[in-house]
Amino acid sequence: MSFDLIIKNGTVILENEARVVDIAVKGGKIAAIGQDLGDAKEVMDASGLVVSPGMVDAHTHISEPGRSHWEGYETGTRAAAKGGITTMIEMPLNQLPATVDRASIELKFDAAKGKLTIDAAQLGGLVSYNIDRLHELDEVGVVGFKCFVATCGDRGIDNDFRDVNDWQFFKGAQKLGELGQPVLVHCENALICDALGEEAKSEGRVTAHDYVASRPVFTEVEAIRRVLYLAKVAGCRLHICHISSPEGVEEVTRARQEGQDVTCESCPHYFVLDTEQFEEIGTLAKCSPPIRDLENQKGMWEKLFNGEIDCLVSDHSPCPPEMKAGNIMEAWGGIAGLQNCMDVMFDEAVQKRGMSLPMFGKLMATNAADIFGLQQKGRIAPGKDADFVFIQPNSSYVLTNDDLEYRHKVSPYVGRTIGARITKTILRGDVIYDIEQGFPVAPKGQFILKHQQ
């Protein structure tokens, strides 16, 4: 058989091992894995490189339509491709209107036409005002529903995202359980975090340490514990977003051991930044839950290596620079990070701490694809989409603002020495990013809908 593409001599991350092996691609799919596979129209030599499944980033905010001046599909998905992401799962908030019904998700589909460099799946929102319309988003094909039990949304904008109270969460979870959809939750205690934040601001306590103190670990743990119990009673599968504390992870582990269907994610910034660095970097490193101290970070690494965290995600949530001006308590909370998930974590987890390549592949791609039912994604295996990223190990560079593809070229990682590089990203058999050529093809990304899987 003649193939479209053969990738030769790379160290390939397979599901349970990593070895030097060749990959054949035909019609955008992985056709064969082995040696001496035959002829191909194109042969790529990956000698000295790690060939990983393309990252499945299960937590990305693209603010188009309505707030494309924050981040748009064109810039956001180019940055993703440059960072080795081939599929993103897009959050239902930051854009206007929020993605809470059929009409709003159709606006997103229209806004993205001709702009997607990578593939994208969608999450619907569970908010205080759409519980009777959740079925609309399920019918369209979202792969899950996101909600906040922390305060969110601009109360001055009618169609912005909104948090839910316990009753709304419970009723929504019941309906999502009936639909077979997971609920994803931002877990912080709204009343306590809001009160502590207002108290700090009124007393002039506005440093990074003050911000972290206003959102203490117990506010995350309490919220996780609460939604675990409510989701269990409601009969709904649960996914905890961006866990920032080992104590929070322990709640998920305990629930799993008791038989509950629950998964969780965390983000690179909780593993490579700490509160002291947050103080130095300033508002660009503000997010919620916050970046905590070094002892907390050490505990998170332990949980990651123990296999208690299912996947790593960017939680890419940028904004215009003026919204990061002023003191930390007043600035927008969100990190621009999707371009540097894979290289930073390959350096920190694999090269510096000895994580196995198969575990890295699961954390960056396989587990997220499985959790959200993306059956063609997340694995280098025959029949799957030919989505790959080439990683050059032990190749250091210093990240600059000019390296970034975001709408606004800022990131808390600027100035960081990163010890690995993404050299090529391939989506369904086509190179969508190359370190020498840039972006050699027109945007070819597609939306992935649940019922098409």
From Swiss-Prot:
One annotated Gene Ontology cellular component of this protein: cytoplasm
PTM characteristics: Carboxylation allows a single lysine to coordinate two zinc ions.
Cofactor: Zn(2+)
Binding locations of Zn(2+) 2: 146, 186, 242
Enzyme class: hydrolase
Any one GO molecular function term: zinc ion binding
Annotated signal peptide: none
Family matches, as CDD domains: L-HYD_ALN
PANTHER family: ALLANTOINASE
Annotated protein name in UniProt: Allantoinase
